[in-house]
Design a protein with these regions (language model features):
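Outer-membrane beta-barrel translocator/receptor signature
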Residues: 59, 73, 86, 95-98, ...
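Periplasmic-side early beta-strands and strand-to-turn transitions of outer-membrane beta-barrels
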Residues: 129-130, 138, 153-240, 247-249, ...
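Non-catalytic regulatory/gating segments with a bias toward low-complexity or hydrophobic composition
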Residues: 22, 30, 41-42, 100-105, ...
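Transmembrane beta-barrel domains of outer membrane proteins
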Residues: 41, 103, 123, 136, ...
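Short acidic/polar hinge/loop motifs at secondary-structure boundaries
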Residues: 80-106
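N-terminal periplasmic "start-of-domain" segments of outer-membrane beta-barrel proteins
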Residues: 3-33, 59-60, 75
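Outer-membrane beta-barrel transmembrane strands
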Residues: 87, 188-191, 197-199, 209, ...
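Extracytoplasmic beta-strand/coil segments of soluble accessory domains associated
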Residues: 22, 39-82, 98
Length: 289
């Protein structure tokens, strides 16, 4: 029987003993289902729904029907024990992920704000556990491709680090007839991650995690559907019949995002208790036009 143990500053119990509805996705599960972002969790985990709105600006997560389309999210997201507060930061690259834990139901007692509906905890790979270099490449129709490279190195029994980067390109599907059928929803993204773990003593751990990601996405693949039924009832006639079903914009529409995340975790294990201090910093600068 496989036993999965959840070990965080909040709890250290076997998963089956937790008084909560939980789901764990291992690295093998994520590879088999091509989970490369949080939006791919829809359909894999019970009671969770993440609609695809197009850009990374809005990543609304619903668990058991509880969620938020705008403003403050109702589902929390933690990455290596660091909370991600804004929904615009939820959709990032998952090339260096070891495990995903999903806790359904209110988690505010332990995790505070933004966890009324549930919590998603993402764990990156530890350089003490994984060694070597991980290279991934992928390609798909409509000129979609991606590549990532991560190196894990254990220098000694006290220090190990991992560093890597990724790049992905989406060729787009919808065409803009006003710009010579240019793909309106194409996009590019790239970034990197560094993690260093230092064990100065047997009972003391210092864990630093820094990641950066830049995204440039096309957007607004909307088209004219014709006059509404309300307009027809008022006696109006269709004046733009030739534009029905066509995407036609004079200018490009884009969403730019710069996302920097940093977290530092200090954990001290005493004889009868564990003392943990987690500090996080997030810088999000984006623009949609």
């Amino acid at each position: 029987e496989e036993v999965v143990v959840i070990a965080t500053p909040k709890e250290n119990r076997k998963l089956r003993e937790l008084p909560a509805a939980t789901t764990v996705l291992s690295q093998k599960d994520m590879q088999a289902n091509q989970v490369n972002s949080v939006k791919r969790l829809s359909g894999l985990i019970p009671n969770i729904f993440i609609p695809e709105y197009g850009s990374k600006l809005t990543t609304s997560i619903y668990i058991r029907g509880i969620g938020s389309r705008i403003n403050t999210p109702a589902i929390g997201l933690y990455v290596d024990n660091i909370p991600y507060i804004d929904k615009s930061a939820f959709d990032f690259n998952y090339s260096d992920i070891e495990r995903i834990d999903v806790l359904r139901g209110p988690q505010g007692t332990l995790y505070g704000r933004n966890t009324m509906g549930g919590l998603i905890k993402v764990h990156t790979k530890s350089p003490f556990t994984y060694q070597g270099t991980d290279i991934r490449m992928g390609a798909a129709t409509y000129n979609d491709y991606n590549v990532s490279l991560t190196h894990y190195h254990r220098i000694s029994d006290q220090f190990a680090f991992s560093t890597g980067g990724f790049y992905e390109h989406t060729g787009g599907f919808y065409q803009n007839s006003a710009r010579n059928n240019e793909r309106v929803d194409k996009g590019n993204a790239g970034g990197g991650r560094f993690r260093g773990i230092y064990l100065p003593k047997d009972n003391l751990k210092l864990d630093l995690n820094v990641s950066y990601e830049y995204s440039d996405q096309g957007g607004y693949p909307y088209f004219y559907t014709g006059i509404t039924q309300e307009g027809i009832n008022k006696g109006k006639t269709e004046e733009r019949e030739e534009m029905i079903g066509k995407i036609a914009y004079n200018d490009r529409s884009n969403y730019y995002r710069n996302l920097l995340n940093a977290g530092f975790n200090v954990e001290y294990q005493a004889k009868n208790f564990i003392l943990s201090a987690v500090t996080g910093y997030q810088h999000l600068k984006d623009r949609m036009f």
